[in-house]
């Protein structure tokens, strides 16, 4: 039974500013010097020894003696043979939905005549070589393959490689194949990030690394980005978060289930319910006690609930003010007419509107991406999408007439900034046009 000292509803306006800040403080991110040094050791070895270091670390950390790091095409092709029809059907359905939503994200071309003789364009080019990291662990994560692989394929990246700890389950290989990924390597952890960041005899150096992972993977991404100054990363993943805003129309059974769906991710998961209805808060609290008894990861959930919060506000609008300050990874709005509140939301990774929109839908099959900013980064960072696998290149073309039109503006501004060479790059052309060179 979960301790009754947890999840005690707190009235927001009865708290001091300091207490309010504490209520919204996330669990401390477990980053310490020991992890930094461990990861640095791994990165140094992979940088110097290449594939030999990867084979060594596979044996050391995953207890697998890998003769070949690359998964053979034949194994990928046959990976679906051991999967049941319902599993294949679910994967296909999710891929269809995710593909449809992400295809709609494709950047439109911009081609505009600003003034006569001055044309500006924005052209889109895919990243050439990208690396996808899919964590291992006690259960396979085919959804991560989809969330990374589908937008990469839509963006038309030229070379997509995937790394995952050995032995890689068939369901991961099958899902990757359906997402158009053919280059798969059995290597995990910080060493996989190092391989993609530096390149080895087997694994190419990539332009950008995508994918979640544990604290060692996250630290490896941080260090690789800093060391190479060339390899980009998608984002630094933190513990999972959910914030639910609910009114009296909400169902406490649904709320409890949604909160627990995030609590089971890990002991550092942060779950918050904000409501103006104390009765709903108490009902949800009791429902949490009931539902947790039927779940598998009870110890993890218990740890997560030690820093869970139920906040009582004076009105529904105050809920959104608090949520914007917190900037949650997942924001669920379980109220009457939830779409009316969208205009008040400024900070959130992904929003789930209404009583029939569980967070699990976005995690797997609604079509949106589940790679989202955490730890308050939703104030400045967006969910993963097709744009993250592309770059925008700007083009401008001026005719003689166009340059004559702009010349006085350019020269005036270059004089203000005292950049004479800039000014003369225009003057020489104007003189040529006027025949005075």
Swiss-Prot record:
Binding site for Zn(2+): 262, 265, 363, 422
GO MF annotation terms: histidinol dehydrogenase activity; NAD binding; zinc ion binding
Pfam families: Histidinol_dh
Catalytic reaction(s) noted: L-histidinol + 2 NAD(+) + H2O = L-histidine + 2 NADH + 3 H(+)
Keyword Oxidoreductase attributed: yes
CDD domains: Histidinol_dh
Names of the cofactor(s): Zn(2+)
Keyword Magnesium appears in the UniProt entry: no
Cofactor note: Binds 1 zinc ion per subunit.
Active-site residues, Swiss-Prot/TrEMBL: 329 (proton acceptor), 330 (proton acceptor)
Domain of life: Bacteria
Complex formation: Homodimer.
Annotated family: Belongs to the histidinol dehydrogenase family.
Protein name (database record): Histidinol dehydrogenase
Annotated organism of origin: Blochmanniella floridana
């Amino acid at each position: 039974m979960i301790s009754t000292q947890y999840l005690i509803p707190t009235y927001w306006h009865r708290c001091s500013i300091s207490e309010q800040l504490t209520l919204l403080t996330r669990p401390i991110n477990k980053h310490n010097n020991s992890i930094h040094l461990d990861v640095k050791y791994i990165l140094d070895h992979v940088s110097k020894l290449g594939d030999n270091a990867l084979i060594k670390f596979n044996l050391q950390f995953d207890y697998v003696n890998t003769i070949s790091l690359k998964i053979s095409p034949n194994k990928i092709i046959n990976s679906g043979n051991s999967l049941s029809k319902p599993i294949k059907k679910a994967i296909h359905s999710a891929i269809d939905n995710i593909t449809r939503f992400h295809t709609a994200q494709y950047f439109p071309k911009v081609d505009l005549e600003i003034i006569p003789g001055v044309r500006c364009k924005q052209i889109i080019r895919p990243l050439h070589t990208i690396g996808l990291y899919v964590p291992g662990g006690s259960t396979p994560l085919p959804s991560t393959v989809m969330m990374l692989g589908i937008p990469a394929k839509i963006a038309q990246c030229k070379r997509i490689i995937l790394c995952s700890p050995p032995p890689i389950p068939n369901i991961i290989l099958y899902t990757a194949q359906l997402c158009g990924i053919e280059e798969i390597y059995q290597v995990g952890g910080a060493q996989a990030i190092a391989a993609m960041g530096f390149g080895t005899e087997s694994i190419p150096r990539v332009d950008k690394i995508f994918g979640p992972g544990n604290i060692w993977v996250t630290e490896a991404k941080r260090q690789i980005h800093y060391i190479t100054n060339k390899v980009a990363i998608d984002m630094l993943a933190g513990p999972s978060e959910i914030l639910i805003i609910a009114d009296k129309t909400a169902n406490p059974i649904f709320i409890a289930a949604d909160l627990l769906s995030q609590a089971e991710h890990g002991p550092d998961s942060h779950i918050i319910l904000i409501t103006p209805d104390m009765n709903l808060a108490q009902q949800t609290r009791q429902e949490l006690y009931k539902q947790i008894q039927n779940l598998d990861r009870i110890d993890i959930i218990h740890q997560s609930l030690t820093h869970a919060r139920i906040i009582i506000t004076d009105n529904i609008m105050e809920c959104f003010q608090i949520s914007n300050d917190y900037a949650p990874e997942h924001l669920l709005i379980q109220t009457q007419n939830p779409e009316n509140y969208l205009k008040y939301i400024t900070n959130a990774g992904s929003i789930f509107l209404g009583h029939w929109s569980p967070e699990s839908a976005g995690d797997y099959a609604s079509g949106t991406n589940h790679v989202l900013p955490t730890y308050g980064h939703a104030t400045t960072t967006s969910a993963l999408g097709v744009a993250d696998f592309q770059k925008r290149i700007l083009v401008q073309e001026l005719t003689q007439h166009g340059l004559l039109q702009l010349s006085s503006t350019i020269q005036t501004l270059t004089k203000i900034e005292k950049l004479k060479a800039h000014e003369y790059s225009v003057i020489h052309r104007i003189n040529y046009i006027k025949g005075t060179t």
